UniProtKB/Swiss-Prot annotation:
Name assigned to this protein: Cell division protein DamX
Regions of compositional bias (Basic and acidic residues) in chain numbering: 7-36, 50-64
UniProt function note: Non-essential cell division protein.
Effect ascribed to mutating residue 351 to K: Eliminates septal localization
Length: 428
C-alpha cells in the first residue's frame, strides 16, 4: 500500500476533470452569453508595494535572523559583562604590595651584608694591633754576661748592664778572588777557639768525642755556660761558699775534665821537647807512682803547670808520668796505649767505633781482624765510655786514605780522622 504524502493533495487528479472544455472556460462562456462583464486579469496591474501573503518558509527564514540577532546580542552582553568583571581584577592594587615588600627585603639583606663585612674587617684588624702591643710588652732583655751565681739564685741582671768582654765587634769578610784559591783562615780573636767537628754531618754532634771537645771549648769561653767554679779561684770573694755547694752537687768525674782543659794548650810544648827521653822513662816511673791517690794527681798537674813550662824539661816530664798512673790503675784498655800518648799531638788516628760495653767493643775488633787497634776508656755524662781507634797518621789526608784498607763492615761504621790531642786529653 502506498504511503500517503502531503504533496498528493496538491496534485490534481486527471480523472476528476471533464473531458473537453474545462470548468473555467465553461463558466466564462456562460457569463459571456448572459452578457455579464468579464474581468481580464491580464490587464490588471499589481503594485509591488502590495504585501504578499508570506509563506511558512519565508516566516522561518525571517525568524532565523531574528534569533541570530538575539543570540549575538546576548553574547555581546555576556562579553561586556565579562569585560566589566575582569577590568576591576586587573586594576587591583594588591599586585603592587608584594613588589614593594621584595624591595624592602632586598634592601634589608644588603644592609645585613654590609654590617657583616664591616664587622669582619674590624675583627681582622684588631688582633694585629693587640698582638704587636703584647709582643712589645713581652720583650725581655737577656744578658749572657751576668754572674753565674745570680743565675743559680734566679736573679736576672739589669737590662742596661753590659760587660767589657761582650763588646760588639765588626765582622769583615775576606775579599773574593777571581781565581779559585784555598779559603783563608779566619783571624782568631782573644778568648776564642776554632773547633773542627770530625765525621759525618748526621752523627758528628752525637759522638762523645765531639761533645767532649765542645765541652772543653765551652770551659775556655767567656760565656757563663759552666758553673761558677773559676770565680773563687780568681777573685776569692764571698761567693766561694756558693761555688763550693754547686760543685759538690755535681759528680766528681767532671772536675778533672775542667782542670785538663787548662793544661791542653801548654802540653804540646812539653811533649815536643821531651820526645826522645820520656819514651823510655814513662814505663819506669809508672811503677812507683801507682800507689799515688787519684785525687792528688789532678791537683799536681793543674797548679804547677803554668810555672814549670818555663823551667827545665825533666821537671815537666814528671807531671805526665803521674797522670798516666790514674788510667792504668782502674781504666780498661786494650792495645798499645803508650804509642798514642808518645805520638805528637798534631798527628791523627782513625776512630772506628765507641760503646758503653768494653767486652762487646773489644770482641767486635777481634772479629773484624783489626790490627794495631786501641780501646781506651773515657767518661760520657758521668758514665764510663769506651772508644776504639786504629793507627797513627801524620796528616788528616793519610788517615782518610787508610779508611779504604779497612774491612767493609768497619767502613760501614763511617770511621773518621780524630786528632791525637783529643785522644791524649781523654787518656789523662
Amino acid at each position: 500500500m502506498d504511503e500517503f504524502k502531503p504533496e498528493d493533495e496538491l496534485k490534481p487528479d486527471p480523472s476528476d476533470r471533464r473531458t473537453g472544455r474545462s470548468r473555467q472556460s465553461s463558466e466564462r462562456s456562460e457569463r459571456t452569453e448572459r452578457g455579464e462583464p468579464q474581468i481580464n486579469f491580464d490587464d490588471i496591474e499589481l503594485d509591488d508595494t502590495d504585501d504578499r501573503r508570506p509563506t511558512r518558509a519565508q516566516k522561518e527564514r525571517n525568524e532565523e535572523p531574528e534569533i541570530e540577532e538575539e543570540i549575538d546580542e546576548s553574547e555581546d552582553e555576556t562579553v561586556d559583562e565579562e569585560r566589566v568583571e575582569r577590568r576591576p581584577r586587573k586594576r587591583k592594587k594588591a599586585a603592587s604590595k608584594p613588589a614593594s615588600r621584595q624591595y624592602m627585603m632586598m634592601g634589608v639583606g644588603i644592609l645585613v651584608l654590609l654590617l657583616l663585612i664591616i664587622g669582619i674587617g674590624s675583627a681582622l684588624k684588631a688582633p694585629s694591633t693587640t698582638s704587636s702591643d703584647q709582643t712589645a710588652s713581652g720583650e725581655k732583655s737577656i744578658d749572657l754576661a751576668g754572674n753565674a751565681t745570680d743565675q743559680a739564685n734566679g736573679v736576672q741582671p739589669a737590662p742596661g748592664t753590659t760587660s767589657a768582654e761582650n763588646t760588639q765587634q765588626d765582622v769583615s769578610l775576606p775579599p773574593i778572588s777571581s781565581t779559585p784559591t784555598q779559603g783563608q783562615t779566619p783571624v782568631a780573636t782573644d778568648g776564642q777557639q776554632r773547633v773542627e767537628v770530625q765525621g759525618d754531618l748526621n752523627n758528628a754532634l752525637t759522638q762523645p768525642q765531639n761533645q767532649q771537645q765542645l765541652n772543653n771549648v765551652a770551659v775556655n769561653s767567656t760565656l757563663p755556660t759552666e758553673p761558677a767554679t773559676v770565680a773563687p779561684v780568681r777573685n776569692g770573694n764571698a761567693s766561694r761558699d756558693t761555688a763550693k755547694t754547686q760543685t759538690a752537687e755535681r759528680p766528681s768525674t767532671t772536675r778533672p775534665a775542667r782542670q785538663q782543659a787548662v793544661i791542653e794548650p801548654k802540653k804540646p810544648q812539653a811533649t815536643v821537647k821531651t820526645e826522645p827521653k820520656p819514651v823510655a822513662q814513662t814505663p819506669k816511673r809508672t811503677e812507683p807512682a801507682a800507689p799515688v791517690a787519684s785525687t792528688k794527681a789532678p791537683a799536681a798537674t793543674s797548679t804547677p803547670a803554668p810555672k814549670e813550662t818555663a823551667t827545665t824539661a825533666p821537671v815537666q816530664t814528671a807531671s805526665p808520668a803521674q797522670t798516666t798512673a790514674t788510667p792504668a790503675a782502674g781504666a780498661k784498655t786494650a792495645g798499645n796505649v803508650g804509642s798514642l800518648k808518645s805520638a805528637p799531638s798534631s798527628h791523627y788516628t782513625l776512630q772506628l767505633s765507641s760503646s758503653s760495653n768494653y767486652d762487646n767493643l773489644n770482641g767486635w775488633a777481634k772479629k773484624e781482624n783489626l790490627k794495631n787497634y786501641v780501646v781506651y776508656e773515657t767518661t760520657r755524662n758521668g758514665q764510663p765510655w769506651y772508644v776504639l781507634v786504629s793507627g797513627v797518621y801524620a796528616s788528616k789526608e793519610e788517615a782518610k786514605k787508610a779508611v779504604s784498607t779497612l774491612p767493609a763492615d768497619v767502613q760501614a761504621k763511617n770511621p773518621w780522622a780524630k786528632p791525637l790531642r783529643q785522644v791524649q786529653a781523654d787518656l789523662k
